[in-house]
Structures are given as C-alpha cells and as structure tokens.
A protein has these predicted regions:
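Substrate-binding/catalytic lobe of Class I Rossmann-like enzymes that use SAM or dcSAM, i.e.
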Residues: 221-303, 307, 311-317
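Conserved beta-strand signature within the Rossmann-like core of class I S-adenosyl-L-methionine
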Residues: 199-214
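Conserved class I S-adenosyl-L-methionine
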Residues: 96-105
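Core SAM-dependent methyltransferase catalytic element
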Residues: 272-275, 326-340
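Conserved SAM-binding loop of SAM-dependent methyltransferases across substrates and taxa
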Residues: 106-121
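Class I SAM-dependent methyltransferase Rossmann-like catalytic core
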Residues: 46-91
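A short, conserved alpha-helix within the catalytic core of class I
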Residues: 184-196
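N-terminal auxiliary segments of SAM/dcSAM-dependent transferases
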Residues: 2-52, 60
C-alpha cells in the first residue's frame, strides 16, 4: 500500500519491528463515531448499545474468561472442530494464501489455524482486524511463538478493516470469522456484512465462518448467564467504557444483567436492566439519558441457526459452499466458502 492511499483512507501506520506493524484510523474519527452512535442508540424508546463496543481492553479480557467457563460451550466445541481440521483445511489452500482474521488473535483458535499454515508455509502473513488495542499485545506474543510469522494489524471495526485491506495487496486471503459473533447481527446487518466480505474478496479467496446451532434452551441460557457472574461483569463493562471515553456518570450498581432465549427468533437476548428511575449524563454525546425502573437497554442478541438456514444465508450472497464441519454434539459449525 502506498502512502497516498493510506492517507486518503485516514489511517496512521505504526511499525513496531521488522515483523510487526499496524494501522489505525485517526482517533478523532473513532471517538466521534462512538459518541454519535451512543447518542443515536440511547436517544429512543427501544434503547440499545451496539455489542461491538463491548470489546475495549477490559471487555476483551472478560470475554476471554467467558470462553473458558464450563457453561460457555461455543469456544470448546469450536476448538474441537478446529483440531479436526489440522489435516483437512490445508486441502483447500496453497502456499500463496495469507491469513486474515476478524478478531484479536488472542485465543487458542488462532493458533490452531496458524499451526495448519506452518505445515505448508515458511513465511506466514497474518492480518488481524480488531477494534480493541489488545491486538498489539496478542500479536507480540504470537511473534514469539511463530518464527515465520509477519503481522500487519488493523485496529478498526471489521467493516472498516476489510475495506482498508482491499487496497493493501493482491495476494489470496483465507478470511476467518471464528466464534459466534456473526449471530450478534440482525438478519439485515448479517446479510449486509456478508455482502461486504464478498465484495472485498478476490476471486480465489476463501472465507471460514463459525456459526452457533439451535439447541436446548437451558443449554443456551446457561451459556449467557454463568454461575460465576463473568457475563454480568462483561455486560456492565460497556457502561464503564462509556463513562471513561465519553465522560458519562453511569452508576453500575444501578443496573443488572438480564438474558433470555427467544425461541421464535432463535436468539439469545441480553439486556442491562435499570434498577430504579435514574438520569445519566453522557457529556461527549451532549445527552441526558433518563431511565425508568425496570427499563431495558438491549446490548446483544446472538442468533442460532439450522444448517439449512446457514446454507441459504451464504448462498444468498453468492458464496459457494466448499465444506461444513461440526462438533460431535452438533452444537457448532464451521463452514468454508469461496467467491467462485
């Protein structure tokens, strides 16, 4: 990427060493977007906070803890699938592929994919895209563990990072979207997101996506309301972030975590419940938020899918299904698709 394109896209380049660099949008753009989005999403009757704002440094750390909880099945089931792919995924790839991940690369799942790449590539070019600053920390640790790894991080939203990457080079990509984050989108958002993926993919690119499957309601609700209260802390942390970054005065003791599985819409719904009538100042959004007792702020939904829905979803955008892998209990799926 030349300096002119980088400047036009409003990104700044940081070079940490010969194998690690990252790009980040100018901070004023991010702050403006955060303040505007919070104002827009809370200044309405049906209040919500976009779940992408969960993942500051503390939020990302809390989510890593959630992933190790016994109730939270998605991570361990997806890992079990990835272990099966150690000899299978490489059949669809060659040594000209570079790796793009939507996420920080902090988990064992990233390492399982990198292990596959090391079997047929001496030099691995890896592009993690994450809105959280944890990206640089996780990248530094990966460099210590993988000698042939070269990392170019993009600290931005997934959509922003993908559009930036489209102009970066002409090499083939395997794009990863692991975990069950796709389920956080509404159907309209999900379709638009997949269209974005499709539009930035080159003809020979591949896309590997993790999707959570429909299962027993009790299993689902336990996964999002754990006995140790880590999910509660994770949910409340988004208010702490608004306090810190937008100069707000949320009192976290005035809110509780609430989640439920909506069978009709096949999704977990997660909320912050106001425990009293209260007012909150959000200075950088120039906004006074008034909440009634028991009023809900929607913070996340996590859709669950049947396999036929997954295929219809991906085919509807234009993807060609290459293969789907499941865990032993059919709790989770990984589907590999191509553009052509």
């Amino acid at each position: 990427m030349n300096d002119t394109i980088q400047k036009n896209l409003q990104y700044k380049k940081y070079v940490l060493d010969s194998r690690l660099q990252y790009f980040k949008p100018h901070s004023s753009i991010i702050e403006k977007t955060f303040a505007e989005e919070i104002f827009s999403s809370l200044n309405r009757d049906s209040k919500f906070i976009n779940p992408k704002f969960f993942y500051d440094k503390k939020g990302s750390d809390l989510f890593e803890k959630i992933c190790s909880l016994p109730e939270y099945y998605p991570t361990r089931t997806e890992i079990s699938i990835l272990k099966k792919l150690q000899t299978k995924l490489s059949l669809f790839l060659d040594d000209s592929f570079q790796l793009v991940e939507l996420g920080s690369g902090a988990s064992v799942k990233t390492r399982l994919i990198l292990d596959i790449f090391t079997k047929f590539k001496a030099k691995i070019e890896y592009f993690p895209i994450d809105i959280s600053e944890i990206l640089t920390e996780s990248s530094e640790q990966l460099l210590k563990d993988y000698d042939g790894l070269h990392i170019t991080g993009i600290i931005d939203t997934y959509e922003g990072g993908l559009k930036f990457l489209k102009n970066y080079n002409n090499k083939k990509n395997l794009i990863l979207f692991l975990g069950s984050s796709f389920g956080n989108f509404t159907p309209t958002e999900g379709h638009k997101f997949l269209q974005t993926i499709y539009s930035v993919m080159k003809p020979d690119d591949m896309f590997l996506i993790g999707l959570d499957l429909v299962k027993d309601k009790q299993i689902l609700e336990s996964a999002y309301n754990d006995s140790k209260g880590i999910t509660t802390k994770f949910n409340l942390n988004v208010l702490s972030r608004i306090n810190d970054e937008l100069d707000a005065d949320f009192n976290l003791n005035n809110f509780s975590h609430y989640s439920i599985y909506n069978t009709k819409h096949q999704r977990i719904e997660m909320y912050l419940k106001s425990l009293m009538n209260q007012s909150v100042v959000i200075s950088k959004s120039n906004f006074l938020l008034n909440l009634a007792k028991d009023e809900l702020i929607h913070t996340e939904h996590s859709h669950k899918y049947r396999l036929d829905q997954i295929y219809n979803l991906l085919n509807g955008v234009g993807f060609k299904i290459k293969h789907t892998w499941l865990d032993d209990h059919d709790y989770f799926s990984l589907t590999l698709v191509s553009k052509n």
